[in-house]
């Protein structure tokens, strides 16, 4: 994950990430006594929901600053900094849960293999992340605005089709029990700065490719390009498309 994370901005203006994750927790249905790994736990906003039925929840995230915030806000949970592609924790887990994380990691096959190693036979892998076409208007504008200013920028995100990701899971040893791709237009918090806040929170790689003294010009052009599609009723919206899945590890 190449983004530089700001825990305060994340919790203050992008809590919708965790709020939408509540229905994913219901789908995962952690049970009393189960061992659950929250893969990409961030600031820990879903830890209590995952443990509410009596499961023992461990968190893992690639950002030290996010994990520090989670440890301070949610004492009593085992939380670790680690790489989703190659983590090693005391196994096995009954459930690996992940929300809004996997699109940050293009090496999807490595993640799937790591998850499979961490699960017991019959263990569940339940997740949601950006799917094919996610934030297309925003991404296209970020790239176009950069090109117009003479900068060659690249998207850091992995937004696969259902077919592509189902294949990844199958090869890693999973039986896929659910795979959905759906639109979720999401209202951003601030009616004026909502899109800029989103780019500052999630689009750090784009901003890193533009000189800081030109950020304002760059972001203004991104807003200009997206306004006809993503600004309505006085608010900015992100054109999210989500890939939601459930899978079970096949017995060895």
Name what the model sees in each region.
Residues 85-96:
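A short acidic, Gly/Pro-enriched loop at the edge of an enzyme's catalytic core
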Residues 95-108:
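A short SAM/SAH-binding and catalytic strip from SAM-dependent methyltransferases
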Residues 158-172:
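Short alpha-helix
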